[in-house]
Amino acid sequence: MEAFFTPEPFSRLPTEIPIMSNIAAIFAGQGAQAVGMGKDLAADPDCAALFAKADDILGFKLSEICFEGPAEALTKTNICQPAIFVMSAACFTALRKLRPQTAFCCAAGLSLGEWTALWAAGAVSFEEAVRILEARGRFMQEACEAAPSGMVSILRVPVETAAEIAAATGCTVANYN
């Protein structure tokens, strides 16, 4: 738990941060990407350093894709997964700089966002997370290209109606929310 309050790169923060807090850090999953994301944050040297470090690790300019696009590249899983992680890490870095006194009781994320939560909690390094998410995204992209498929949301209808729609189109209802 203590690692969450002073994770790298935040070792410069005060060590006497109260453990009791009701503030959680929640991180977004895939689908949160948009061209231009992070461009304003990159004006901060610490946030810019995260984008530059990711560029070096990945061997391509992820920062340029985030800041300038094209949208087609940013929506590919092998690009958007590390991109969303780096953007979320930059947001958290900026928040910690603006409000260093803020104590978090926990970190959580939706799917891909779990990796940002692990980083924020000090469980994985930035470098490890970028490498893992590049591989995760690449494997998922390859799987999508090998077996073209898709998903659709059916909202505000009874489960029976959703099942009828799915059956009529050769699909299966897979998730219920």
Residue ranges and their predicted role:
Residues 94, 98, 118-123:
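Alpha-helix C-terminal capping segments
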Residues 30-32, 58, 120-177:
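Alpha/beta catalytic cores of group-transfer enzymes, especially the acyltransferase/condensing modules
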Residues 52-53, 86-90, 114, 127, ...:
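A broad detector of short, well-ordered amphipathic alpha-helices
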Residues 8-19:
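Short, Lys/Arg-enriched N-terminal segments with co-localized hydrophobic residues
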Residues 110-118:
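Glycine-rich nucleophile elbow surrounding the catalytic serine of serine-hydrolase chemistry
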Residues 21-108:
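Helix-rich "cap/lid" substructures immediately adjacent to catalytic or cofactor-binding pockets
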